Amino acid sequence: MGGLSLLQLPRDKFRKSSFFVWVIILFQKAFSMPLGVVTNSTLEVTEIDQLVCKDHLASTDQLKSVGLNLEGSGVSTDIPSATKRWGFRSGVPPKVVSYEAGEWAENCYNLEIKKPDGSECLPPPPDGVRGFPRCRYVHKAQGTGPCPGDYAFHKDGAFFLYDRLASTVIYRGVNFAEGVIAFLILAKPKETFLQSPPIREAVNYTENTSSYYATSYLEYEIENFGAQHSTTLFKIDNNTFVRLDRPHTPQFLFQLNDTIHLHQQLSNTTGRLIWTLDANINADIGEWAFWENKKISPNNYVEKSCLSKLYRSTRQKTMMRHRRELQREESPTGPPGSIRTWFQRIPLGWFHCTYQKGKQHCRLRIRQKVEE
């Protein structure tokens, strides 16, 4: 009893203390005070709400939708590797979303695939859908395949980026790049951040000589497209091909093309001549990380926003170029059911969307900061 008496409070003080305890509990429930601190480099959504995005969204002009290419994450961009990331499904309607700005792609793709009966595998592009405007290399592939489904989707849940439109499906005969859509939150909206396109613009942006960004085309033939095992042939001319059986770079294919022409190894008959690659040949020549030395727009889109920490890459030495590793096996991912790292960087969890009068309204979810 003596021990208990030390813990007891006078009745009036007990009422005051319990009152303040309940006030603190209700206050925490109402304002969602963070009960922990960030002790490592891993940020949770609730922690980012408090520590990263503290600015209030004053206008929708502060939100900028940007297309981010997957090749910036180091995925293999050769045709045999890329086609393994795409697959056919039925019963899922395609979805299209617009975006305001994007990167210049090093690798784009253009597919025209037919079924064995001669019908088309891929749907034509809807009105208003044009090809991705900035491509260094366009991989044009023709061929046949079972195409077991209505549409070709991305197996990792990414988008196919077209000209300021991103779709979940591949359209026939249109240049596209693989990517995702992110939303940048600018502290203050600036008119110069995203310049509006001219009223009249060329259908093919790459024809604009002022861009200093020439586009090169590589042609392929694919057999059994959409199946687990497919064959990819690099086209030298109408009768000369090279079988591609491992990851490679666009620069390697151009060098291979020049070598075959130089040594006059073309087919001299009406039949097909198919070459195979020597196992000792290095197929990743010239593959410097394009995002470190490619030509960019004169106006660098650099803004300090509350999402800057999310898109900050690992620290690297300046004035250095690094080779991208192209191996048969991709880097290990998380446990089954996890999301790819490049997909986790999309801050979709910070926007709260509601439907009012048949229209969708989205706003940034900002937790109020408790004044000390």
UniProtKB/Swiss-Prot annotation:
Gene Ontology biological process terms from the UniProt entry: monoatomic ion transmembrane transport
Residues carrying covalently attached carbohydrate according to the record: N40, N204, N208, N238, N257, N268
Record key words, sorted: Cleavage on pair of basic residues, Disulfide bond, Glycoprotein, Ion channel, Ion transport, Secreted, Signal, Transport, Viral ion channel
GO cellular component terms, A-Z: extracellular region; host cell membrane
Keyword Chloroplast attributed: no
Domain of life: Viruses
Disulphide linkage map: C108-C135, C121-C147
MF GO annotations: channel activity
Region (Disordered): 320-340
InterPro entries: GPC_FiloV (IPR014625), GPC_filovir-type_extra_dom (IPR002561)
Parts forming coiled coils: none
Signal sequence region: 1-32
Site positions (Cleavage): R324, E325
Family: Belongs to the filoviruses glycoprotein family.
Record's protein name: Pre-small/secreted glycoprotein
Gene that encodes it: SGP
